[in-house]
Amino acid sequence: MPIDSGLSRRHILRILAGGAALAAGARPSEAGEARIGRLIGEAKTLPTIAQRIDFISGALRGTTYQGYTLIGGPRRPEQFVVRDDAFDCVTFCETVLAAARARDTAEFETALREIRYRNGIVNWFERNHYFFEWGQHNVANKTCRWIGMDGAVDMEKMVDSQKGLSKRRFAMRVIPSAIFLAHKAVLQSGDIVGFVSRRANLDYFHAGFIAFARDRTLLLRHASESRRRVLDERMDRFLAAYRVRYVTLLRAEQPAAAVAVKKAI
């Protein structure tokens, strides 16, 4: 079967607001531009979205970690940026999820816009800045669903760590880490795990995908700031190293039909 790798520079880096050229640091490599298109073509033969997420995220291991790759601000026009040569933890999750939902690069771009922004509107104030809102938004648009476990508890957070946004009050249902590790059997490769912050004014400090080693050891597949790349590491060790008390889980929904390709806003 021929592989779709037609991801041109203009297509993958279309600027949807402002009209200015992207900064040089926001450009992917030429090899990176072709990589997402190739992975979409290979992954679309897999029957479930969990398998596609596992395949695509695994293929991106080794990619560089880089924070602050998105462009925009309260007083700066938002630009729709796609990076497949560098990720932070959230752009890694949303790029993989969009690619897993797509059958070609046009669907990928649409899916990524719908995942990153409320109603797919490319505007800084519509971007899902807090990961709890990212989850809420992507449950509402049927991209994901929340996964609970017996023993989960309620938590309320008042967050204000993002400059330019008003305070938000989040009522969260969170899973204690010990319960999470004890219920490995209910997890699937490709589930999205969010790590709840110990800070009072922040919802999460990190996110990544569930993965499994061949011996079924539970792994975290993520864009690691400390290790500066996308990698797998043992979940129990990550939880211990960062003294994680609570997590939340999202599971990607199987797309009911092709992602509708919308005209850029």
What feature does the model see in each segment?
Residues 232:
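A short macromolecule-binding patch
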Residues 198-202, 226-228:
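Solvent-exposed loop/turn segments at secondary-structure junctions
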Residues 1-11, 15-21:
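N-terminal secretory signal peptides
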Residues 217-227, 236-265:
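Low-complexity, Gly/Ser/Thr/Pro-rich intrinsically disordered linker/tail segments
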Residues 156-198:
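A mid-sequence, solvent-exposed acidic-amphipathic segment
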Residues 201-221:
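Catalytic nucleophile-His microenvironment captured as a short glycine-rich beta-strand/loop
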Residues 28-166, 170:
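N-terminal capping segments
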